[in-house]
Amino acid sequence: MTNIRVLIVDDMAQVRSDLRTVLPLAGQAAGLQIEIVGEAGNGQEAIQRISALQPDVVLMDLEMPVMGGYEATRQIKTHCPDCRVIALTIHGDETVRQKASQAGVDDFIVKGAPINSLIQAMAKEKE
């Protein structure tokens, strides 16, 4: 079974909690072992934790206080170019997608999409 280490970055505690609960179960059903190695409530916290946690995948909200996902992604990609950053956002318009891509986001999932979409995006890390 493929192991994927995940850092969840979102300012909403409920979103982090839901992902922490659902991802390992959905991953297991897809033949993946998803390990939630940590959480952060904003981009600055994520950057502070990235070296110690060494995730394969960072699930990144784009709009957060203190430091948003765009700037956090740019900094994460500088220090950890092999980390796969997947944006999780309520904004699915093309302008947001382009801005995320320019920041270094590897994949883009609109919140509320089927969990399988997120699992597939995470599985790309290990292909």
Where would I find each of the regions flagged by the language model?
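Non-catalytic signal-transmission and effector/linker regions of two-component phosphorelay proteins
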Residues: M1-R5, A30-Q33, N116-E127
